[in-house]
A protein has these predicted regions:
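Gly/Ser/Thr-enriched, mixed-charge loops and adjacent short helices
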Residues: 13, 129-258
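N-terminal small/polar loop signature for handling phosphorylated ligands or for N-terminal nucleophile
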Residues: 36, 51-56, 61-128, 216-276
Length: 478
């Protein structure tokens, strides 16, 4: 069984058994449930203003949804199922076709939609696909909202629209241009400086929609010398699509053979960004957010946020400017919530996810590229020189499977108690901060697994810390 329902939506491998994999039936059920959820919200708002007996039909006629997808092989099939289901619910559909996750998020705002569905399994292999759900702000639904949507998938009282109330369909192909235009209008994006720098850039777009969006962005920024690796939008990923070191040998080798200034790698839906220096060495995806934040904080003093499993390098940069860094629970929706609470000017996740609220509250590789190129252009520094400004921290990641009978909450409590003499954060699992290192222990939302993240000034120390926590877990379960 691969079908996983979580706070970000539903995902699974294509085909197989209904309810166990991502089948057409599951796509229709989940799309219907999300539509019902949005209709419920609309009706609750409207009921205080109208007592019309035909309220539901009126509400449906006003509903608008944006749909976008990455280039996965199954994407066009899932897209047709999603759009047809929404129309059958009486909802107007704005279909972006091939798009990116941040572009779809932006389109929800720009099209004044009630919500959106992104058809992408992000960095998962090509046999996977997923539906990710957006509210009317172009942000992911909350955990509580996701629970309600899952409950609605089991309802047998859903009413589809009658023939005279079916929703309309519009294919909108300018969403990427709209997104790029909004980025170019940001005060901290300096097109003139980037154009004058005459950068030579190489991209790895993993045969997905980065190949659509990134060349458009770079052209508008005045970058004319661009090489694209894996630029066919056929959904056949040339390598494991997660932008982590073991998957990026191709672009690193290409850079070492030519005179590029910088390389950018994105995942299939373009919400994560990895950077490669002019020497063909990895910038380290944990430092994508760090460098972009450094540039933003130079010009816009303010607070920062990243999740508890992200590098402490962001805190170092934030401290440099006398501002406040706040960690959040893992998950984009949690990062965004904390950013709003603390009025953060920049935030994100250490997996290369940059969230710049001046544009929108969502991870966005396009705005990350625009801000980073501006940083390079205005500082006059090479990519590698920018990376050298920051301390070298090393993160080690481990996981251990648990028997389904294990009380994970109690286990995490025992770990917190064992390390109570140190600084302990219980917002999401247990994070323990030592003098110059930390470890984060948390349970998976979908599997009986404990994940362990440790960071230190050397890889061996980080590995020792993670291994010690693995040993503690085994001991506490005995």
């Amino acid at each position: 069984m691969t079908l996983i329902k979580s706070i970000s939506g539903i995902r699974g491998t294509i085909g197989g058994t209904i309810g166990e994999n991502l089948t057409p039936v599951d796509v229709v059920r989940f799309t219907t449930a999300f539509a019902c959820f949005l209709l419920e919200n609309r009706e609750q708002t409207a009921s205080s203003q109208s007592d019309s007996s035909n309220l539901q039909d009126a509400d449906r006629s006003m509903m608008r949804m944006v749909v976008g997808r990455d280039a996965r092989i199954s994407g066009s099939i899932v897209n047709r199922l999603v759009c047809s289901t929404l129309q059958s619910m009486g909802i107007e559909v704005i279909d972006l076709g091939l798009s990116t996750t941040p572009t779809t998020e932006m389109a929800v705002i720009q099209q004044h939609a009630d919500g959106g569905i992104i058809i992408t399994a992000s960095h998962n292999p090509m046999q996977w696909n997923a539906l990710k759900l957006l509210n009317n702000k172009g942000e992911f639904v909350s955990g509580e909202e996701a629970k309600r949507i899952v409950l609605l998938t089991e309802s047998d009282e859903i009413q589809y629209a009658t023939i005279d109330k079916l929703g309309s369909y519009t294919l909108y192909e300018n969403a990427v241009k709209d997104h790029v235009d909004a980025i170019l209008n940001l005060p901290l994006v300096d097109k003139n400086a980037i154009t004058k720098a005459n950068f030579k850039v190489i991209l790895d777009t993993v045969n997905s929609t980065g190949a659509l969006a990134l060349p458009v962005l770079l052209k508008e920024l005045g970058v004319n010398d661009v090489t694209v690796l894996n630029g066919e939008m056929n959904g056949v990923f040339a390598h494991n699509p997660e932008p982590i070191p073991e998957n990026l040998a191709g672009i690193c080798n290409a850079m070492s053979r030519s005179n590029y200034d910088v390389g950018f790698v994105v995942d299939p839906d373009v919400d994560r960004l990895a950077i490669v220096t002019e020497n063909g060495t990895l910038f380290n995806e944990e430092y994508t957010l760090v460098a972009v934040s450094d540039y933003v904080l130079q010009h816009t003093p303010g607070n920062t946020v990243s999740n508890l499993s992200s590098s402490r390098a962001l805190k170092d940069v934030t401290d440099k400017y006398g501002m406040t860094y706040t960690p959040s629970a893992v998950g984009e929706v949690n990062v965004v919530e904390m950013m709003k609470k603390t009025n953060a000017v920049i935030g994100g996740e250490g997996n290369g996810g940059v969230i710049y609220p001046e544009l929108h509250y969502g991870r966005d590789a396009l705005v990350g590229i625009a801000l980073f190129l501006t940083f390079m252009a205005k500082s006059g520094k090479k990519c590698g020189q920018i990376r050298a400004q920051y301390p070298d921290y090393f993160i080690v990641k481990k996981k251990t499977e648990l028997d389904s009978s294990v009380d994970i909450k109690a286990l995490l409590g025992k770990i917190a108690e064992k390390y109570s003499n140190y600084q302990v954060n219980r917002v999401d699992g247990v994070r323990i901060d030592f003098e110059d290192s930390w470890v984060h222990v948390r349970s998976s939302n979908t599997e009986p697994i404990i994940r362990i993240y440790a960071e230190a000034m050397s890889e061996s120390v980080a590995d020792n810390i993670a291994s010690k926590l693995m040993s503690d877990i085994r001991e506490l379960m005995a």
